[in-house]
């Protein structure tokens, strides 16, 4: 291809950089990497390691700075032949308007749904969904944001889920006893609380959490979410998950698909027919069976549909 501009987000500052550099270099290309403004150090260290290992200097350049300065210059430069971007939908749309006739790969956001059927193994489903919702403080494009639970087990699932969430220890993330640390900055924490408050004003119920101290937002569980509010249809990118009661698998799938995102979906069930029905009808790039949406290994295909990727 030639020169590839790789632009990465803050939430996985080493893994996502490696994802872009490895295939590009293996394919015989040179890369100009623009890591996230707030998390550049791991990218710089990885670049140092690659150079020390013998990578030719002109194969990789790392440029740090603000996206609206460095990123705009990179994506509009005619010498760059491909853009590889991971980040938010709005930033992705802005890049698309500036790149001209270049190849492009985009991994964007999501609002990941999980379906919990009444024939599932409830305990592991609860544990997996709690972990999937609050891992990385919810700052994860495949983190669990919506859970559609069959009405037969809704109350039991809810009680176990809320109880397990309340057990989470929050605080300094380098403390080994901490389950969940702060968000990337206080500005984002304020935004998350604003979305929660807006949902409550519209009739949603906050079962636990919903508060913050500085950039630390307590893990939050919601229910009775009105359709169309931000928490229902947009990507929160924070430690907030909403529970929904459904009567059938088809109802769960229909509601799962009723957003403009489609990265990962998941279903908990012991019925293989339910699993294959979800695989066929959920409008997402990947479906996880009997684990949460927050599952990905580096060797598996990964990508989304609708506003989740290109």
Language-model-detected regions and their locations in the chain:
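Rossmann-like NAD(P) dinucleotide-binding subdomain of oxidoreductase/dehydrogenase enzymes
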Residues: 1-124, 246
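Short, solvent-exposed beta-strand edge segments and adjacent coil->beta transition regions
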Residues: 2-3, 111, 142-144, 177-179, ...
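Residues that line or immediately flank small-molecule/substrate-binding pockets and catalytic motifs
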Residues: 8, 87, 151, 270, ...
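Glycosyltransferase donor-binding loop in the core domain
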Residues: 16, 38, 148, 184-187, ...
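A short hydrophobic/small-residue beta-strand
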Residues: 30-32, 206, 286
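ALDH superfamily catalytic-core signature
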Residues: 54, 82, 90-226, 249-250, ...
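Conserved C-terminal structural/oligomerization subdomain of aldehyde/semialdehyde dehydrogenase
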Residues: 80, 115, 166-169, 196, ...
């Amino acid at each position: 291809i030639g020169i590839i501009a790789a632009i990465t987000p803050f939430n996985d500052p080493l893994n996502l950089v490696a994802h872009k550099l490895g295939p590009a270099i293996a394919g015989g290309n040179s890369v100009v990497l623009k890591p996230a403004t707030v998390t550049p150090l791991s990218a710089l260290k990885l670049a140092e390691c690659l150079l020390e290992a013998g990578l030719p200097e002109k194969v990789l350049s790392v440029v740090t700075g603000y996206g609206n300065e460095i990123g705009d210059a990179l994506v509009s430069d005619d010498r760059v032949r491909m853009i590889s971007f991971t980040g938010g939908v709005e930033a992705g749309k802005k890049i698309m308007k500036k790149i001209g006739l270049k190849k492009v790969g985009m991994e964007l956001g999501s609002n990941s749904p999980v379906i919990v059927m009444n024939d599932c193994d409830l305990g592991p489903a609860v544990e997996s969904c709690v972990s999937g919702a609050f891992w990385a403080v919810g700052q994860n494009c495949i983190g669990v944001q919506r859970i559609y639970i069959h009405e037969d087990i809704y109350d039991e699932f809810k009680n176990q889920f809320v109880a397990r969430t309340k057990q989470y220890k929050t605080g300094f993330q380098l403390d080994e006893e901490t389950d969940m640390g702060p968000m990337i900055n206080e500005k984002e924490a304020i935004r998350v609380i604003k979305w929660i408050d807006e949902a409550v004003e519209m009739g949603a119920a906050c079962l636990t959490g919903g508060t913050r101290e500085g950039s630390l937002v307590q893990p939050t569980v919601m229910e009775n979410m009105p359709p169309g509010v931000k928490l229902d249809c947009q990507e929160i990118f924070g430690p907030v998950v909403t529970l929904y009661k459904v009567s059938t698998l088809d109802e769960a799938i229909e509601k799962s698909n009723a957003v403009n995102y489609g990265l990962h979906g998941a279903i908990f069930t012991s019925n293989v027919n339910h699993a294959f029905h979800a695989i066929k009808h959920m409008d997402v790039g990947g479906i996880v069976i009997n684990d949460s949406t927050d599952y990905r290994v580096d060797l598996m295909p990964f990508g989304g549909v609708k506003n989740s990727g290109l």
